[in-house]
C-alpha cells in the first residue's frame, strides 16, 4: 500500500500495525504519563525493531537508485516513516508490502523532483539531515521543517559543507534552524571536507550530495563515526573506499555520478533500541533475556563493550551478516555491575546510549565517569543535563563536570521521582528501565515520543515481565 493517512505533523503517514495485543504507541499532542515499578525478573526472547540508521539510509538510497529496492525489517517508527514520506514527495515510489516490508522504486542519482509541499520530518534529525544532503545534489529547492524539538536543533554544521558543494540556504532561522529552504546545486562540486566533530550525519550528508558531483568527494574524520552510509553505498554499487586516518580517524573517498542499482536490504535489529531491554535485564535480579538479530557493527557497540567492562553477562551467538552489517543473538543475564571510566573516543560508537548507560551506572557499585559527551547537548534535548536530572530526582548522586557525567553508584536506586522527558524518546525509555529495578516506582511525565523510534517498546517490555501502569 502507498504511504497514506494523517501523521504527527499534519503530513501523510501509514497506519502502523502491532504484533502485540497491546496498543502500539503513536505520537499525539496529549501527554501520556506512565509509571514503572519493579516486578521481579525479566525473561523471554524478543526482537527489537529494525535499526533506525539503516532504515533511513535504505529508503534514501533506494530512492536514489535505478530500479526496485526491497527492504525487510524496516523500523516503522515515526522518524523513519517521515523519511519514507519525504522520498515519496521527491518523486520515488514507496510502498509498504507487508509487516516491516517495503518496496522503493528509485529515480536515480540527482533525479529528485520538486516537492509540492514542505518536507516535514517531525522529530527526526537524522532523516532531515541526510535528506538535506541528497537534495543538495539536485537542481531543485525544498522546504525542510519539523516539530518544535527539531526546530530548536542546529543545522549549520550540515549546511556549511553543502554550501561549499554549491547548495544555497534561501531562507531559514538563526543558526540554520528549521524551517528552512534549501536550493540544491545545478552543478554540484566535489570537495574534500574534514568534519569538525565525529558525526555520521555530517559525513553522510556530504557523501549523499557527492553522489551527484563529478570527480571525487572525500570526507576526513579525526574520530571514526558509524559507517552505515559507506557500507550501504557499496551495497548499492557506489565506488567508495575507507582507509585509516591518524590514530582513530577515517578517510572516506567517493567517486561521484555512479548509477546506483536497486538492492535487497535486510535491516538488523537496532542496538540503540536493544540497549533498553539489555540494561533492564542486567539490573532486574534473576533476569535472563534473549534478543535476536541485533546489529553488532563495531562502530555501534560501544555500550555493550562498556557494560562488559562493568561486569555484564552478554553472550553472542548465531552471528551472521547482510549488506556488510554483522548481527548476532544476544543473551543477557542479571549481573552485579561495577563503576568504570568511559573514554571520550568511545562516544561516537554509543552516543545515543549514554542515557541508559547512566541508568546501569546508577545500579553499579562505585563511580562511573563518562567523558566527552558534548554531542549530547544538541540532541532532541540537552541530554547531558536531562540525564543528570533523571538520576537526581530518583535519589542518585550525579554530577555534570564540563562535558563529563559522573555517577556515584550504590548498587541500588531509591526511585520515587517523576522524570521530565523534554519531548525526548530516549529519556522516557531510560526512566522506564530504571523503574524496573528501583526501590520505589519511577514516573515518566510523557511517553508519547517513544513512538518516534520504538513504537512497540511498552508491549515488548511487558511481554518480558515489566510492570508499566
From Swiss-Prot:
Role, per record: Catalyzes the transfer of the enolpyruvyl moiety of phosphoenolpyruvate (PEP) to the 5-hydroxyl of shikimate-3-phosphate (S3P) to produce enolpyruvyl shikimate-3-phosphate and inorganic phosphate.
Keyword hit for Amino-acid biosynthesis: yes
Disulfide bonds: none
Protein name (database record): 3-phosphoshikimate 1-carboxyvinyltransferase
CDD domains according to UniProt: EPSP_synthase
Family: Belongs to the EPSP synthase family.
Alphabetized HAMAP family for the sequence: EPSP_synth
MF-aspect GO terms: 3-phosphoshikimate 1-carboxyvinyltransferase activity
Residues the entry annotates as binding 3-phosphoshikimate: 52-53, 57, 199, 201, 352, 379
Alphabetical UniProt keywords: Amino-acid biosynthesis, Aromatic amino acid biosynthesis, Cytoplasm, Transferase
InterPro entries named among the record's database cross-references: Enolpyruvate_Tfrase_dom, Enolpyruvate_Tfrase_sf, EPSP_synthase, EPSP_synthase_CS, RNA3'P_cycl/enolpyr_Trfase_a/b
Annotated region (Disordered), positions in chain: 21-45
Amino acids binding phosphoenolpyruvate: 52, 125, 153, 201, 383, 426
GO biological process, one term: aromatic amino acid family biosynthetic process
Recorded catalytic activity of this chain's protein: 3-phosphoshikimate + phosphoenolpyruvate = 5-O-(1-carboxyvinyl)-3-phosphoshikimate + phosphate
Pathway where this protein functions: Metabolic intermediate biosynthesis; chorismate biosynthesis; chorismate from D-erythrose 4-phosphate and phosphoenolpyruvate: step 6/7
Cell compartments where the protein resides: Cytoplasm
Domain of life: Bacteria
Active site: 352 (proton acceptor)
GO cellular component entries: cytoplasm
EC code: 2.5.1.19
Assembly and binders: Monomer.
Amino acid at each position: 500500500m502507498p504511504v497514506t493517512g494523517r501523521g504527527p505533523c499534519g503530513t501523510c503517514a501509514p497506519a502502523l500495525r502491532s504484533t502485540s495485543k497491546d496498543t502500539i504507541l503513536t505520537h499525539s499532542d496529549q501527554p501520556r504519563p506512565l509509571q514503572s515499578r519493579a516486578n521481579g525478573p525479566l525473561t523471554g526472547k524478543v526482537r527489537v525493531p529494525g535499526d533506525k540508521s539503516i532504515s533511513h539510509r535504505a529508503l534514501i538510497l533506494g530512492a536514489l537508485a535505478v530500479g526496485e529496492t526491497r527492504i525487510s525489517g524496516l523500523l516503522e517508527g515515526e522518524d523513519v516513516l517521515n523519511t519514507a514520506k519525504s522520498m515519496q514527495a521527491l518523486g520515488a515510489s514507496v510502498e509498504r508490502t507487508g509487516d516491516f516490508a517495503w518496496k522503493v522504486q528509485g529515480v536515480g542519482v540527482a533525479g529528485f523532483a520538486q516537492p509540492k509541499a514542505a518536507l516535514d520530518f517531525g522529530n527526526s534529525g537524522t532523516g532531515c539531515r541526510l535528506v538535506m544532503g541528497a537534495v543538495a545534489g539536485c537542481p531543485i529547492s525544498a522546504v525542510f521543517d519539523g516539530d518544535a524539538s527539531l526546530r530548536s536543533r542546529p543545522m549549520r554544521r550540515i549546511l556549511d559543507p553543502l554550501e561549499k558543494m554549491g547548495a544555497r540556504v534561501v531562507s531559514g532561522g538563526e543558526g540554520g534552524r528549521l524551517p528552512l529552504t534549501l536550493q540544491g546545486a545545478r552543478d554540484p562540486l566535489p570537495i574534500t571536507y574534514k568534519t569538525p566533530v565525529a558525526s555520521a550525519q555530517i559525513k553522510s550528508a556530504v557523501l549523499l550530495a557527492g553522489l551527484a558531483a563529478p570527480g571525487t568527494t572525500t570526507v576526513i574524520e579525526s574520530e571514526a563515526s558509524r559507517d552505515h552510509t559507506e557500507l550501504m553505498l557499496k551495497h548499492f554499487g557506489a565506488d567508495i573506499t575507507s582507509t585509516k586516518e591518524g590514530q582513530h580517524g577515517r578517510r572516506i573517498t567517493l567517486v561521484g555520478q555512479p548509477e546506483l542499482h536497486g538492492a535487497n536490504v535486510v535491516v538488523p535489529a537496532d542496538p540503540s533500541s536493544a540497549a533498553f531491554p539489555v540494561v533492564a535485564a542486567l539490573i532486574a535480579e534473576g533476569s535472563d533475556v534473549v534478543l535476536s538479530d541485533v546489529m553488532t557493527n563495531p562502530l555501534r557497540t560501544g555500550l555493550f563493550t562498556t557494560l562488559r567492562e562493568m561486569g555484564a553477562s552478554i553472550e553472542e551467538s548465531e552471528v551472521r551478516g547482510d549488506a556488510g552489517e554483522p548481527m548476532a543473538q544476544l543473551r543477557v543475564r542479571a549481573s552485579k555491575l561495577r563503576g568504570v571510566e568511559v573514554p571520550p573516543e568511545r562516544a561516537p560508537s554509543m552516543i545515543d546510549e549514554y542515557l541508559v548507560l547512566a541508568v546501569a551506572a546508577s545500579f553499579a557499585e562505585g563511580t562511573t565517569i563518562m567523558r566527552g559527551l558534548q554531542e549530547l547537548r544538541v540532541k532532541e534535548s540537552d541530554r547531558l543535563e536531562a540525564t543528570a536530572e533523571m538520576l537526581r530526582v530518583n535519589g542518585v548522586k550525579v554530577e555534570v563536570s564540563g562535558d563529563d557525567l559522573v555517577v556515584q553508584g550504590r548498587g541500588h536506586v531509591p526511585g520515587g521521582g517523576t522524570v521530565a522527558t523534554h519531548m525526548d524518546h530516549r529519556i522516557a525509555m531510560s526512566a522506564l528501565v530504571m523503574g524496573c529495578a528501583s526501590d520505589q516506582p519511577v514516573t515518566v511525565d510523557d511517553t508519547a515520543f517513544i513512538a518516534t523510534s520504538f513504537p512497540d517498546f511498552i508491549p515488548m517490555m511487558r511481554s518480558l515481565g515489566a510492570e508499566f501502569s
